[in-house]
């Protein structure tokens, strides 16, 4: 993998692969090559345009990003643009069933859970993304081995890396 992407040798539950991606230009690196993953975005989004954030989300959706948790200044906007990218990709189909309108989504991207963690510590948001943010019980995801991808701007990289490599510390600081 390129220098931007580091596969961490971490002891994670269920043998989950853990990738650390440098988010220097807000672009999804093609070399990541994963499907069905949880993403954690730790960034200061104040300098990123709406189009840039939406482009990142749009690039991640075809890789079947199942969950995205955002942390850092202006993380609510990151959350909103991921939601927008999902809702408009692809166009939902509506059908009437048992007297109620239902919406179904493409099997390519059946579900996306998004959260933002404004006002929380980095450790708390990372713990949530790592241990809670996976759509368990959903048939599309039940039998899939999850991958955890942390997309991190340089100022937060070392702390995120250290926490991901030390699950006990992540739990201790994340639950504090």
Where are these regions (language model features)?
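ATP-dependent carboxylate-amine ligase
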Residues: 1-176
């Amino acid at each position: 993998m390129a220098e931007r992407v580091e596969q961490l040798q971490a002891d994670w539950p269920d043998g989950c692969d853990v990738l650390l991606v440098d988010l220097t230009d807000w672009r999804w690196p093609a070399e990541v090559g994963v499907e069905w993953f949880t993403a954690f975005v730790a960034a200061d989004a104040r300098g990123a345009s709406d189009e840039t954030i939406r482009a990142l989300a749009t690039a991640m959706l075809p890789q079947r990003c199942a969950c995205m948790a955002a942390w850092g200044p202006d993380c609510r906007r990151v959350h909103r643009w991921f939601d927008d990218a999902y809702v408009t990709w692809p166009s939902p189909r509506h059908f009437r069933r048992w007297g109620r309108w239902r919406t179904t989504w493409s099997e390519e991207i059946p579900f996306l859970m998004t959260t933002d963690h404004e006002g929380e510590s980095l450790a708390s948001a990372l713990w949530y993304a790592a241990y809670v943010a996976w759509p368990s019980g959903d048939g599309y995801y039940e039998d899939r081995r999850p991958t955890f991808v942390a997309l991190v701007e340089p100022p937060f990289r070392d702390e995120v890396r250290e926490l991901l490599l030390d699950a006990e510390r992540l739990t201790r600081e994340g639950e504090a």
